Amino acid sequence: MSNKKNSEILDQLLFGHNLDDETSRVLMKRWLNNEILDVQTGAFLSALRAKGATGMELSCMAEELLNACKLPIDRPDLFMVDTCGTGGDGSNTFNISTAVAFVASACGVNIAKHGNKSASGKVGSADVLSNLGINLNSSLDKVISAIDDIGITFLFAPIWHKSLIKLAPLRKALGIRTIFNQLGPLVNPLRPNAQVLGVASEDLLTPMASALNKMGMDRAIVVHGYGGLDEASLEGDNKIIFVDNGQLKHSILNVSDFNFQNTSNNDLIVSNNQSYENILESVLKGSGQKAHIDVVALNTSLVLWVAGIEKDIEKGFEKALFSMSKAKPWDKFLSLKAYLET
């Protein structure tokens, strides 16, 4: 194990030098073991943000977090997909990736959705699901078995990564995106086989895709949406990296290449007289605004691709629309709610 002092590692970061495998792991272990003072943590997080975390740093730190997270029962022998992204795009859109999780599950994908409450002003996935009656504190056994019995589950991050709870107030006080925003989507305790991961900044595309690849993800799409969304947008060019069996491929996704209607990102913003919960419910029931339903269908089509269910984006889009038109995603939601109640 590296015997570098915390101050030496901090100096390395402040000079813009990347951390090697061992030092990245040591830094995370020290966080987990409460061996870093709060003032040092603030400095580390700021230095890492200024330098920019590499795929190697992210994958090594994520693996240490996962090693510290023990499952109470065996991982289900299923091909699972997560839709957790970095968040923090500041767009005040409704919870698109949360809606996508239920729609994709209704289309036959086993969804292991990892999420948290908001660290900013926006309502996080855990906030909206809790407000709609999902029990975030269900037994861990139940949370895991739900994906086998229902086809979807929700893993509330603080329940699984308790050692990081003490960092939450400091992260909030800093008021900036930190490396933990990037680590969140990488540390799903069920270690899904595939993922659609939205990033709030274009410069996160390559390190996040590289981290997923280094961690052995079978298939993934990392997407930075037009206008700064951390989801695929219906308005313009979406920058994408496909991760497929060890290979990374950069691409551009624009709805003008398909038979989709162009829609402004502004139509996805939650206004003062709307609630995140009502929008999510209406989308899952297929009764929501067309812009909301269409953007969920677009992003669901990406999930269907990584899951190997639908290779054609347009067909995936139509499959998602059909599912919502029959309110099947809402049925999935109600099933999960009932399952986790006890």
Swiss-Prot record:
GO CC terms of this entry: cytosol
Cofactor note: Binds 2 magnesium ions per monomer.
Gene3D superfamilies in the record: Nucleoside phosphorylase/phosphoribosyltransferase catalytic domain (3.40.1030.10), Transferase, Pyrimidine Nucleoside Phosphorylase, Chain C (1.20.970.10)
Binding site residues for anthranilate 2: R171
Pathway linked to the protein: Amino-acid biosynthesis; L-tryptophan biosynthesis; L-tryptophan from chorismate: step 2/5
Keyword Signal: no
Cofactor: Mg(2+)
Residues binding anthranilate 1, per UniProt: G85, N116
EC code(s) of this entry: 2.4.2.18
A GO biological process held by the record: L-tryptophan biosynthetic process
Keyword annotations of the record: Amino-acid biosynthesis, Aromatic amino acid biosynthesis, Glycosyltransferase, Magnesium, Metal-binding, Transferase, Tryptophan biosynthesis
Residues binding 5-phospho-alpha-D-ribose 1-diphosphate, per UniProt: 85, 88-89, 93, 95-98, 113-121, 125
MF terms in GO: anthranilate phosphoribosyltransferase activity; magnesium ion binding
Presence of keyword Amino-acid biosynthesis: yes
Domain of life: Bacteria
Function: Catalyzes the transfer of the phosphoribosyl group of 5-phosphorylribose-1-pyrophosphate (PRPP) to anthranilate to yield N-(5'-phosphoribosyl)-anthranilate (PRA).
Protein name listed in UniProt: Anthranilate phosphoribosyltransferase
Lineage, uppermost ranks: Bacteria, Bacillati, Cyanobacteriota, Cyanophyceae, Synechococcales
